[in-house]
């Protein structure tokens, strides 16, 4: 009996230790979903009245809390429901976005979905004011009511992996003008009221063979709703305009009712149909390529270079940060807002990394660390 009671005690303690924790970081709330993972969460009810989500959100890939780094792998159900967010850029570390995550956020006009998103969930962007939306490759299903009642929705860009659009998918989207669908065969769209009452929608598909397949489909072949066209070459010239958004980010001006593939060097980092895409300001600078696309054909790339000079330089010893260790924590003071803070242990392992919002307190285990604030290194012993 004592052994059995001990078992239940250990199990109960284990459950307590693994209980999800919600915390705030950089203006967003997160809930732990695993030992090193979090989901963006809705503003807690007791704080929602005075501190709702509003404005632009560039969600980071990683956040730091209570001595540990957490990877952002999801957006929770209803996280931005009825919020005042205007633009949201979701990081590629997120693979799932919950039901109603952005539903009825009526100020939301721009969204960048992550490259590794599994599916477009139920009511994902219902009731928002998004104008153009690109869905990344790999997504198979557009969920129930995902874009229902989006009055400003003009252009949808769907990947070659699209297999199904569920009921009410585009119900009441009366300004939907064009759908670019890279799927070679018509996605199943047999649910109720997916396109009911809509008309004058141009559907652009990969080629003439795909046009024939879509035309033979009971839904996509409805000439009172759709006109089918094969994809053509994309020809658009871009200025490569880039502007400083704030101390942390530069942004590319996009638009034109198309999608854009964004490369950092040779690495694809985004597919978006938003008006803007945000990239971090770093001391090293970076080279980007912007490629307009309709999901089937790409235009020529435009090269954009973010020079290291975009980063504030230290010009006076008084601008150098103060970094020291005390009572198990690293303290950083000074003119550091927007600087990238990186901490390595004595073996070169990364322990902490994020752009600072000002003074920083980092709690770590006992040991020797190298703290890099921008380009300024300091050795600290805890």
Give names to the regions the model predicted.
Residues 77-78, 98-101, 121-124, 143-146, ...:
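Consensus positions within tandem repeat domains that build extended binding/scaffold surfaces
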Residues 232-255, 300-308:
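Pro/Thr/Ser/Gly-rich low-complexity, intrinsically disordered linker/stalk tracts
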